[in-house]
């Protein structure tokens, strides 16, 4: 089992010459081989926590450690942001290869990853021919192309319409089942969290609470147990 172990984490920002503490004395384990959702209101620190896990954000004190069963601490991360960040002058195929300086990604690799996100026939298209949902799928394929151990995703579907989001949630679940890659996914949407997650980490007022869901994805969020879970999470987020 792969996981991130966070010990005694403190994160402080300086604002108007004052120290503002976002996290204090946080101890947490986050699975790196499930779909783990980090859930909370805007400004609660979801993205900051994701950036800390990715090594993009310095911590004020404490430790963040990655462990797996083989005691191998080397790992690769794939990042997917809210904006797809595709280069408009490059085709889908070339966007996926944009960081492939050693030409390790073959045409068959690109076909395979685009097939995973249901875009196999779109590799010659340019971003201006893609919908928002299609652009997000390309961003996911691009992240997968570099064979990461873990995908970190920062509210990648939040700007999309309901139906596109539902389709992409299903795509994400299929990717997890087919590749067995861990996914850490940030959202503020409770329904989305329950639908896709194995674990949900709720952040509220600097406090963390983890819920584990045993049902396979996608969940039927209208089941009584999930309606009760939704109520409990809403109370935490008040």
In which residue ranges do the predicted regions lie?
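Conserved ABC ATPase "signature" region
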Residues: 105-122, 174
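A short, proline-enriched helix->beta-strand linker immediately N-terminal to the Walker B motif
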Residues: 145-149
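Conserved beta-strand-loop-alpha-helix hinge in the C-terminal portion
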Residues: 206-232
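Conserved ABC ATPase signature
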Residues: 126-130, 134
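Conserved structural motif at the start of ABC-family nucleotide-binding domains
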Residues: 4, 23-25
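Helix-to-loop junction immediately C-terminal to a conserved catalytic motif
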Residues: 54
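Conserved ABC transporter NBD signature motif
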Residues: 61-73
């Amino acid at each position: 089992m792969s996981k991130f172990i966070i010990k005694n984490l403190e994160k402080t920002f300086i604002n108007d010459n004052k120290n503002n503490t976002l996290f204090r004395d946080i101890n947490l384990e986050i699975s790196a081989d499930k779909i783990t959702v980090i859930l909370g209101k805007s400004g609660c620190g979801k993205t900051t926590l994701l950036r800390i896990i990715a090594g993009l954000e310095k911590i004020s004190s404490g430790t963040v450690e990655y462990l797996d069963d083989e005691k191998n601490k080397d790992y690769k991360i794939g990042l997917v942001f809210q904006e797809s960040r595709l280069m408009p002058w490059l085709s889908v195929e070339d966007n996926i290869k944009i960081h492939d300086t050693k030409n390790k990604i073959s045409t068959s690799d690109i076909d395979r990853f685009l097939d995973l996100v249901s875009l196999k026939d779109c590799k010659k298209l340019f971003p201006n021919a893609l919908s928002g949902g299609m652009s997000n799928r390309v961003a996911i394929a691009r992240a997968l192309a570099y064979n990461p151990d873990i995908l970190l995703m920062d509210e990648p579907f939040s700007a999309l319409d309901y139906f596109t989001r539902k389709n992409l949630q299903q795509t994400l679940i299929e990717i997890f089942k087919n590749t067995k890659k861990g996914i850490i996914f940030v959202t503020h949407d409770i329904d989305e969290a329950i639908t896709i997650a194995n674990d949900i980490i709720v952040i509220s007022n600097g406090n963390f609470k983890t819920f584990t869901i045993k049902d396979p994805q996608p969940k039927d969020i209208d089941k009584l147990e999930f309606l009760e879970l939704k109520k409990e999470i809403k109370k935490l987020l008040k």
